Amino acid sequence: MEPRLFCWTTLFLLAGWCLPGLPCPSRCLCFKSTVRCMHLMLDHIPQVPQQTTVLDLRFNRIREIPGSAFKKLKNLNTLLLNNNHIRKISRNAFEGLENLLYLYLYKNEIHALDKQTFKGLISLEHLYIHFNQLEMLQPETFGDLLRLERLFLHNNKLSKIPAGSFSNLDSLKRLRLDSNALVCDCDLMWLGELLQGFAQHGHTQAAATCEYPRRLHGRAVASVTVEEFNCQSPRITFEPQDVEVPSGNTVYFTCRAEGNPKPEIIWIHNNHSLDLEDDTRLNVFDDGTLMIRNTRESDQGVYQCMARNSAGEAKTQSAMLRYSSLPAKPSFVIQPQDTEVLIGTSTTLECMATGHPHPLITWTRDNGLELDGSRHVATSSGLYLQNITQRDHGRFTCHANNSHGTVQAAANIIVQAPPQFTVTPKDQVVLEEHAVEWLCEADGNPPPVIVWTKTGGQLPVEGQHTVLSSGTLRIDRAAQHDQGQYECQAVSSLGVKKVSVQLTVKPKALAVFTQLPQDTSVEVGKNINISCHAQGEPQPIITWNKEGVQITESGKFHVDDEGTLTIYDAGFPDQGRYECVARNSFGLAVTNMFLTVTAIQGRQAGDDFVESSILDAVQRVDSAINSTRRHLFSQKPHTSSDLLAQFHYPRDPLIVEMARAGEIFEHTLQLIRERVKQGLTVDLEGKEFRYNDLVSPRSLSLIANLSGCTARRPLPNCSNRCFHAKYRAHDGTCNNLQQPTWGAALTAFARLLQPAYRDGIRAPRGLGLPVGSRQPLPPPRLVATVWARAAAVTPDHSYTRMLMHWGWFLEHDLDHTVPALSTARFSDGRPCSSVCTNDPPCFPMNTRHADPRGTHAPCMLFARSSPACASGRPSATVDSVYAREQINQQTAYIDGSNVYGSSERESQALRDPSVPRGLLKTGFPWPPSGKPLLPFSTGPPTECARQEQESPCFLAGDHRANEHLALAAMHTLWFREHNRMATELSALNPHWEGNTVYQEARKIVGAELQHITYSHWLPKVLGDPGTRMLRGYRGYNPNVNAGIINSFATAAFRFGHTLINPILYRLNATLGEISEGHLPFHKALFSPSRIIKEGGIDPVLRGLFGVAAKWRAPSYLLSPELTQRLFSAAYSAAVDSAATIIQRGRDHGIPPYVDFRVFCNLTSVKNFEDLQNEIKDSEIRQKLRKLYGSPGDIDLWPALMVEDLIPGTRVGPTLMCLFVTQFQRLRDGDRFWYENPGVFTPAQLTQLKQASLSRVLCDNGDSIQQVQADVFVKAEYPQDYLNCSEIPKVDLRVWQDCCADCRSRGQFRAVTQESQKKRSAQYSYPVDKDMELSHLRSRQQDKIYVGEDARNVTVLAKTKFSQDFSTFAAEIQETITALREQINKLEARLRQAGCTDVRGVPRKAEERWMKEDCTHCICESGQVTCVVEICPPAPCPSPELVKGTCCPVCRDRGMPSDSPEKR
């Protein structure tokens, strides 16, 4: 009883506790200034105290709100009238509520609102009228609600909303119009545009959906396009004509117009609308015809018809009504008036006159100025001046003239220009004590004055603030109290323009570690977190490095925002020292820790499946490879993908064996993984499987052995120091004598950043959702089609097309990824082209989005690059799972490997054995010049000879020479350059044998390639900024790995694709088009026969240096030749080069673009607007946002291509960083770099620096006689071209060996690295050595052999010297004695015909033995050669491995599956 009594007492007290002296309405609750009258069945507005601030009348039966119902409640800020029965709100119902903020009218029965309903509610912020019966609104209804932030009109019956209904609601933040019956026709288009503007600027949330028409039902109004609104602005179909009428007659002016909605016809007389109500003589018919009855003299003048609807308006030409009377001189009906007009707008000086006959109107300007006929147009109603400029300022005179007289009237055009900013300041963040300078400039008429304010007031009197006469605000030494908002104002009599900027002043703070990482250990297969935190100003970015390679986000590694490194599924490769780097714009701090990975003893889950999985993997991989070979080489290719696969398929058996072993190794792990998952009782679907706890290290080593990974080529033998001190090995080994495989062919690409695979090991980005992302990566084909546009090519104003083609030629010297050996999936052998599943090696590109080619295929063929065994590490044992790496077939160095091959086997195939002069093989001579073409390849001709009349492929150091006519021409040029060099060197040194000539010529050609690249080509690409970053040569650094970086080969160096022109120009000697014409890019592919049949190499080369390059415009990055028509000359389905590059980057685990920005010390990226410094075009950033969703997912290549070019370069900031990094490594890590002291003599180096591509063209073109000095620079023909005789040459005389009597002939000694003391037989092949040694014994006694040892001999003629003969003879005798000793040693070595194997066991000549179960070895010519046996598919379902046999055994017969009895 007591609690109930207390409650009633409390309510009573509340009811009475209102404002002193003012009554609380009966049954209402009052508390201070709040009055609540709810659930009282009220049917009227009660009287409440005047000081009320909150009035709550909800849940009553109020039906009407009368006028001035709340007039005395000046303090009311909240009025709740919802949940009543209100049907009518009188005009001025809310009069006097100037302070009302919140008005609730929802859930009533309101059908209409008067346009004065909300008049005076100037402070209202929230208005809720939803859930009513509103059927229409008036444009002025919300006109006074300037501060309104929320307007809820949903769940009414609105079908139409008049234009301009929300035009004054500048503070609006939320607008709801959904759940109405909106008809989305032309009348509602204004609302769609308004809502689209809300969405674009982001300051207002709005909702509105279409109910009608049916086709738009449920669509958001903001999403409806202009075309879908089906609007048609008025179009005049019949215009009124001039008429002359006597007094009292009736006149008809006809006007017809069409439009949707039907336009309203309005008539204008002498620039004033006709008022039909005031003059009963006037009438407008339904068809728009104007009738004037009982005409008067006042009716004469100009009539104009205007048709208007919601989509726009249209006016007819003026029609004249002339009142017929007695002859009269002219008199003005309308005179021109002085007009003030803003610059850039248009205006009309109206001038019309009457008279009889009708007067002629003409115009003149004061001061004798003529009218501008292009902008000043005389019409029947006046003078129309369009696009007003400052020159239009002045006086214009209208002349009306007839036979009875002339009248004139003049008016002034006063041109005014309000202030407009020409330079606007930007927000700045600076360190204290740094200077700040804001530029602010404006134009206008009258000229505006620049005024600066701070936080709305004057600039501080104290401090270092200075406003220059130009309007620039300068703060000399910024301090903390200087930060805040500044405003630049451009002030003139026409108005004020303002722009605000924010200054943030931060104290200096370098990065400092707040938590250091500690040495720790982790078990194999476990995850581990390593903390590293730092602070600074700005907040430093934390990155982690391992062994000099930056760690990036992937399925293997994760670095959170605070800097903690997480390593998933730790393995032995993860052991080592890690660096934590804290970097901000003022510096960096580095600390490190050591991670130890400990092994888990015992068997792993996958060990039981090793034997069966390896057998299945061998069978599946071999079967798929054999199937692919049959498909590619037993017939001509059917598709462009077949052509590409055949063209790039490895020819070298060693490459095939290495790639096969890598595929077997990976596929075995995949099979084990699948079988372990099948045996688990826990469902792991959707979770990444962990590799390092899959199988034990012992089982991994077994898999590596059985797959062939450990049977790779032996480590290079660099013991022959005499050869390796002077010449390069063809395969690039032994360049770095401490790390012999650095930069060598058939090694894994290098990395700047750790690979970004989805599972951390092998799964590419693009399979499923990216790590930490909410949406999948866009299909590469979609990305490519966004950037590919068919547009006119913009020519480069500085450079020629040779710039791109030299890069293409150079790229083939540096890298060539080993492709997939199979284009059929391993699981069931089905071709990748017939399935669209990500089943190794298939990694197809989805094309389900709209494809411009119109193909219905759901995907495009793509097969992953072949993996390197154990990431290409040279270790003989494999005890852990490494991240997938790819193999580079080429040597990394700029050494002409695309001319000479990247292996000893290739180089031998290219040399001409018939001529012992160190020449390369030649093809038949080109008839006009007699210079040879490249020889034809003896392999399968199907890539090039697709038709019987076509020639086979050319034979060159790189098979890709046949890929394009320009490449074939460049290869022809350089093979001729070698033979030219070899011929001249042989003539200068007739005592040199063939191999010495070959090696010396090869060495010179390599130096020319280096010099042209770094001195002529790179400065054009990198400009002065990049050249400074690259810095000058400082000597060889053996600690630099010159290997090609994966991201450089896969993405950065593919920048040339954006420079490819869709047309290959072919020019004659005067740079005109040849008779055979130019070629589309795709028709120049795989067509070397065009060189033979259509003019040789000169027309192609002239098209490279005689035509401007393509300018890289972000709006037209790629030609459709590359994305839609590549290889379509021969096949119906083309290949998309751009999409392939993007997919290849994901295949290779190339990290996203933002990770490389961090590596290159650019600003970090959290959202797309953070890219505005490097990608200024907002439209491009919007495209990236639409494609990727998150900046952290952007692929490297497309981002590099859309970066803004650094002025004076052809690259953006990140691409510049990658270029400089790679080319520094290529130069500094090359022991044979041409500028490295000792590689060439100073005299030779001086001559090599005379080399130029222009000279090479002159010397080796078919018949090129004129060329510009620098073929990369655009030049005008003929004035900027030089005769070839004016181009500097490399003088080879400094390579001439000097004889013993050179001093008497006045000659000088000049031989590469003292080669005059070394016998060239050491660098010979076996045939050359045998020939040289046999000659050695039969030399006549009058010859003398001088040298350091028996392997280095130079033949000198015996002569007598007139001076110092005794000393010379003593030296000769001493040398002969040493020579005999060396000859005896050589002969003893030649008599030893045996070998020594890797275990130190002596072997006899021709002896054969088994090194391992699958490895056969033989001793031949003193050298051990081992071959790994390839097993055929087993004919039984469950073959087994038996110790002592190589291939699986079928138990049912107890014999190997490949034994002859089973065939």
Curated annotation (Swiss-Prot):
Query: What is the residue range of the signal peptide feature?
Result: 1-23
Free-text tissue specificity from the UniProt record? The 57 kDa isoform PMR1 is the only form detected at protein levels in human cell lines. Expressed in heart.
CDD domains, from UniProt?
peroxidasin_like
Keyword list, A-Z = Calcium, Cell membrane, Cytoplasm, Disulfide bond, Endonuclease, Endoplasmic reticulum, Glycoprotein, Heme, Hydrolase, Immunoglobulin domain, Iron, Leucine-rich repeat, Membrane, Metal-binding, Nuclease, Oxidoreductase, Phosphoprotein, Repeat, Secreted, Signal
Q: What exactly does this protein do?
A: Probable oxidoreductase. Lacks peroxidase activity. Inhibits the peroxidase activity of PXDN through its interaction.
Residue ranges of the LRR repeats are 51-72, 75-96, 99-120, 123-144, 147-168
Q: Which GO terms describe its biological process?
A: hydrogen peroxide catabolic process; response to oxidative stress
Superkingdom to which the source organism belongs: Eukaryota
Q: Write the protein's name.
A: Probable oxidoreductase PXDNL
The UniProt record gives the binding positions of heme b as H1057
- Spell out the InterPro entries in the cross-references: Cys-rich_flank_reg_C (IPR000483), Haem_peroxidase_animal (IPR019791), Haem_peroxidase_sf (IPR010255), Haem_peroxidase_sf_animal (IPR037120), Ig-like_dom (IPR007110), Ig-like_dom_sf (IPR036179), Ig-like_fold (IPR013783), Ig_I-set (IPR013098)
Q: Cite the source lineage.
A: Eukaryota, Metazoa, Chordata, Craniata, Vertebrata
Where would I find the LRRNT domain in this sequence?
Answer: 24-50
Domain named VWFC is located at 1393-1451
Give GO MF terms, alphabetically: endonuclease activity; heme binding; lactoperoxidase activity; metal ion binding; peroxidase activity
Q: Subunit notes for this chain? A: Interacts with PXDN; this interaction inhibits the peroxidase activity of PXDN.
- Which amino acid positions bind Ca(2+), per UniProt? D813, T891, Y893, D895, S897
**Predominant subcellular localization, coarse grouping:** secreted
UniProt-annotated catalytic positions: H812 (proton acceptor)
Record localization: Secreted; Endoplasmic reticulum; Cell membrane
